[in-house]
Amino acid sequence: MGLVKALRLVLLGEVHPAVVTTVDFDELDGLRLDSALVDAAGFIEHEKVELYDTSSGTRLSLQLRRGKAGEVALCGAAALLIKPGSRVSIASFGWMKAKASLKHQPSIVRVDDENKAIKKNKAG
């Protein structure tokens, strides 16, 4: 298959280094993320996202839901693996035609200790 017809899985958006604010064992599995960060990174609600704990190396695949300002909440089974105060990166990926992927720049959102966006840019 030539470069033009191939599909590549590429980073679409990332939020880092976010701080986990709460865990909720009784809620449906997933991640609640500050709505402003969802929009800034180009995520969509119910999208599959990857979450990486930058200190332990734990990696999870989660459903994304919109949360309150400053919120990074792990729900359900994920709450057993990562604790409040942990620093995490949250990323989404998507398929693109190889040719388009060569020019693609993902949305990268850096946040402060209160999970407020301090810088948004395109990677590259």
Predicted feature descriptions by range:
Residues P106-G124:
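Short, glycine/charged-enriched hinge/interface segments at domain edges or termini
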Residues G2, R8-V10, V19-T21, F25-L102, ...:
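Compact, glycine-rich, soluble single-domain proteins
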